[in-house]
Amino acid sequence: VVILKEETTGEIKGFNLFNASKYMELDAQGLVEVTPELAEKIAAALAANGAEVSLDVDFSPKFVVGYVEEKEKHPNADKLSICKVNVGEETLQIVCGAPNVEAGQKVVVAKIGAVMPSGLLIKAGNLRGVDSFGMLCSARELAIPGAPEVKGILVLDTDAEVGSAFVTPTK
């Protein structure tokens, strides 16, 4: 086990559990939903490897279905758009560089605190002077098996429920 800590504060930011398959079975590729059961297995594996910590886990979904209510051109960047995206309980402002984003689409939103399959942590940011509170995701960024190598976000079917957790499809 490697414990990742903030250098200045010593706050624990994450763990790297080597050979995790010895402690738990993960059926999914790409996004893995952390359930209370999975958190218990992770805590037990950490304890078995000498890491005496308590896990404080937020079980709210971090990858959700969103509805692009508005899209406007970014005032300081030709290839960026400012989107207002309804994610169920709130509407988020998200700056997006995908060429195919349009108002009226249902999309996958990585909310603040999401960890992409690549390891990228989603946090609030500012892109060319405009605040952004999440990310609209492509199939490739979500590590969906067989995802096409095309530019742009993943546009979902119209029957996808806004605010519901997005789960990686299995073929």
PLM ranges: what are they?
Residues 1-171:
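Phosphate-backbone binding interfaces of nucleic-acid-interacting proteins
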